[in-house]
């Protein structure tokens, strides 16, 4: 089995923490030197509880000697793991709506502080929903009426999410976008895979295997629609939180379902359309929601050669379990 890159993602924001302490940490927190011509090896951002430092940018030079600092980081250049693609935040419908309520001047200032690699924190990744999420105005997909001929980007995307993404990319064109659906269109759902009774609900259900290829083409249409707006989609996952039955918009997709969808629907649809967007599997918690038959979800899919050829890695959330699971998956 080929090792896969592991991509960790969290719904909401990624937190960047540089320093913390007790209530008197303004007296004890080490103060980094201000950037100098010699201190260019590392850029650090410092925040303390007294807010005397609030993501304050500073520079640091590598050294070979020992020191008494309690926050020393020791690097071994001979040992290398995966490359870090970046850090970022979720751009949901509600996030985009709230940003659009700001004045253009204030919004540009905020987005520059967040995404600019020259004048801000340099966030380099954003996560968005394919269709609705649990931070949307309501539940919807891009094709609520049966048949892909009815596919269209929803108002939440065209009026809020896409304009915000364009402003972000104007500030930092290198920002990467990863996306996931919270649910497939309801007309693609069944209550169970055994009986395949139609399931007219935004919450839970399964993707009807009869629609695996159709749903793969749905992804292609969505990616192409965003590309027409000048927004390249770096990666997708087949399903946000696939083991979560209870979200406002959700779809249960066990590892066997994900495997079969990828190798017979999503992967072939991408290949036929020439879509270069990466596919990450899983996109849920380290503990697999304590479902014994779903443990090691990604590696079970990797073991299938037909599915694995389309997969770039795995995505994880930090809501449950221990991040040491990433080491197990990497092995």
Where in this protein do the model-derived segments appear?
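Sec-dependent bacterial lipoprotein signal peptides
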Residues: 1-18
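Bacterial Sec-dependent N-terminal signal peptides
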Residues: 16-38
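Flexible, active-site-proximal loop/turn residues at the rims of small-molecule/cofactor binding pockets
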Residues: 30-31, 132, 242, 320
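N-terminal zymogen propeptides
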Residues: 36-65
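Surface-exposed molecular-recognition determinants
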Residues: 47-48, 172, 318
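N-terminal catalytic cores of secreted or lumenal carbohydrate-active enzymes
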Residues: 55-233, 264
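A cross-family glycoside hydrolase active-site/sugar-binding cleft signature
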Residues: 90, 127-129, 178-180, 237-239, ...
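Active-site neighborhood of glycoside hydrolase catalytic domains
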Residues: 214-235, 242-331
